[in-house]
Design a protein with these regions (language model features):
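Short hydrophobic/aromatic beta-strand micro-patches
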Residues: 9-11, 78-82
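Short amphipathic alpha-helices within nucleic acid-binding modules
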Residues: 21, 85-90
Length: 126
């Protein structure tokens, strides 16, 4: 069996707020939450097979980078869905603006940034 990605861990300002919209938009659930490294707080949000680990530090860096040229940065998180249009409606209802829509072989996609300026790519494959 080839290796499989289990989770991605990234930093947010408010883990509970991020977890709430992730569950609403993607139909995920909170798998675990609790104290974390450096007096922070973490939540695991996703499905039975995979998840994102969102980490809220005790003190937040006021100058996060959003540049693709930053080494050790996160460019975007890609998520596949069964119904792109319905997911886009939920993304917009959560208060986020979608952009960079594209139809391509073998599917369709759009992007959005959350309140922490983390970029997400949402894809529906045909």
């Amino acid at each position: 069996m080839p290796a499989q990605l289990e989770h991605v861990n990234y930093t947010v300002r408010d883990a509970r707020k991020t977890a709430a919209w992730l569950c609403d938009v993607f139909g995920w659930q909170v798998r675990w939450e609790g104290p974390s490294i450096h007096n922070g707080f973490s939540m695991h949000v996703g499905s039975d097979g995979d998840y994102v680990a969102i980490y809220q530090p005790e003190a937040v860096n006021a100058n996060p980078s959003t540049n693709y040229a930053t080494v050790n940065g996160l460019n975007h998180i890609g998520i596949t869905v069964d119904d792109l249009d319905a997911t886009e409606d939920r993304v917009k209802s959560a208060g986020f603006t979608t952009h960079s829509h594209a139809d391509y072989e073998p599917g369709r996609r759009f992007y959005f940034h959350d309140a922490d300026q983390i970029e997400y790519e949402v894809v529906q494959y045909d």
